[in-house]
């Protein structure tokens, strides 16, 4: 069954690939951030790649609907994707990327999931997740003092980043200007409800998993779960990286990403 899945994906991508010549990469950011979070990564990527980094609904300059769920976020992104796109999803963006890869496979050539999860909230059948009371506490903190706790959240994500203070000074003003507590609350509720586990076996494209070994938000055990349940996945753990390895270890992550994409494109 696995071989048939690979064969089907391979032939479909080969036919579609004839329509394009340039590598197309879409970067999907995480909760409470925006597309500017990828600025430190961009200089390390090949200059001849076409790179698209949209703001998820309710983040950055993208307006927030009355309610958010992963399907809505994914449909919004998928509708703007060209076929044969390489998807890079970080944290919440990684969950959206999983949904797109499962439901819009003709749009996705490869998947790279960075510091993300199949399910964030713990449950009886998923003990590796984060307890609900911690999620609710996070939500209340943001409602209480949005600027203060957004800065603290960003500091946590950028642990072990040498230029952390400079990056926070660059990123935080845009995040405060464009984000709202209401939008973040809706997105956090979408994260709490998200469960991609039933979709993992449907994701046929090659997948690279990148996690930081010091990540407390999405610890490596969440990457190990994905590696065990995705049909064609490789797990890479970046040493001394926390929740944003594409910032703290941008050159190393870019190297892994480029190696992954080049290998996939050689197959098609």
Segments from the language model and where they lie:
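Conserved alpha/beta-hydrolase catalytic His-Asp/Glu region
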Residues: 143-194, 198-199
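Catalytic histidine-centered segment of alpha/beta-hydrolase-like enzymes
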Residues: 241-254
């Amino acid at each position: 069954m696995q071989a048939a899945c690979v064969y089907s994906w391979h032939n479909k991508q080969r036919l579609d690939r004839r329509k394009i010549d340039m590598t197309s990469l879409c970067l999907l950011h995480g909760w409470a951030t925006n597309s500017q979070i990828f600025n430190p990564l961009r200089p390390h990527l090949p200059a001849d790649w076409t790179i698209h980094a949209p703001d998820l609904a309710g983040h950055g300059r993208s307006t927030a609907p009355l309610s958010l769920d992963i399907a809505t976020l994914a449909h919004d992104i998928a509708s703007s994707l060209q076929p044969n796109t390489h998807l890079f999803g970080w944290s919440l963006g990684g969950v959206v990327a999983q949904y797109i890869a499962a439901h819009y496979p003709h749009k996705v050539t490869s998947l790279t999931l960075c510091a993300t999860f199949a399910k964030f909230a713990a449950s009886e059948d998923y003990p590796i997740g984060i307890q609900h009371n911690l999620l609710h506490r996070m939500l209340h903190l943001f409602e209480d003092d949005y600027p203060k706790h957004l800065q603290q959240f960003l500091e946590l994500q950028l642990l072990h980043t040498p230029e952390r203070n400079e990056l926070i000074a660059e990123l935080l003003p845009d995040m405060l200007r464009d984000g709202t507590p209401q939008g973040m609350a809706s997105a956090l509720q979408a994260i709490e409800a998200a469960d991609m586990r039933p979709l993992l076996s449907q994701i046929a494209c090659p997948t690279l998993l990148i996690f930081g070994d010091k990540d407390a938000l999405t610890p490596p055990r969440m990457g190990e779960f994905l590696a065990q349940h995705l049909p064609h996945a490789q797990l890479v753990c970046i040493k001394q990286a926390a929740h944003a390895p594409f910032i703290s270890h941008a050159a190393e992550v870019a190297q892994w990403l480029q190696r992954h994409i080049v290998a996939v494109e050689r197959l098609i």
